[in-house]
Amino acid sequence: DEKFQWQNTNTLSYADSFGKHHLNVMLGNELVFTQSRSLKAANNQFPDDNFGIYDLSLGSLPQKPESSFDETGLVSYFARAFYNFDDRYLLTMTLRTDGSSKFAKENRFGWFPSASAAWRISEEEFMKPLQRVISSLKLRASYGQSGNNRIGNNRYSSIFESNWYANGSSEIPSLISKTLGNPGLKWETTVSANIGLDFGLFNNRISGTVEVYKNKTKDLLLTADV
């Protein structure tokens, strides 16, 4: 067996501060290419057990050879912006698109935006009198989408595998259907929404989180019997 993977990631960042405003922006892209191949040959009934190590042809009961070749490509582009005002109001926005060779051309790319915001309530002026009790208090919320392409290659087209069938005293090579193709396959998408409250009491001797979230997945990628 042989496997080769090539990965290239490039990012460009910009950060600046003006007064109580802080901004950080990042742009990037990533390329991933994977290739694997395998070859299998076997034989049995050698005159001596050691012969098969050096020469498979010395056996008298050869097995059917097997070989495979597989390659996948993934390209991603992403952008992220983070804004912070006075360490009280925080905002993050992200947009990424991913393209996978595992899907047909018309469904190759998926778009996955996300955003999150947070308010450090404990930094507000009206919380000063309570600081001895409430050390930290932050309200946060987020919404976003993420993609999944964890399926085998070429599932959008029908796959055949080699086989042999008996014809009298001989075997004839043939092809049989392994899976039925689905050209409508596309990125599985999980939509996540979250709201939470983080708190710390008595100089953070006591801390905790109250959180509510909801995840919903659509366009599930799975194998079903027909």
Model regions and ranges:
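Extracellular/periplasmic, surface-exposed regions of secreted and cell-surface proteins
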Residues: D1-V226
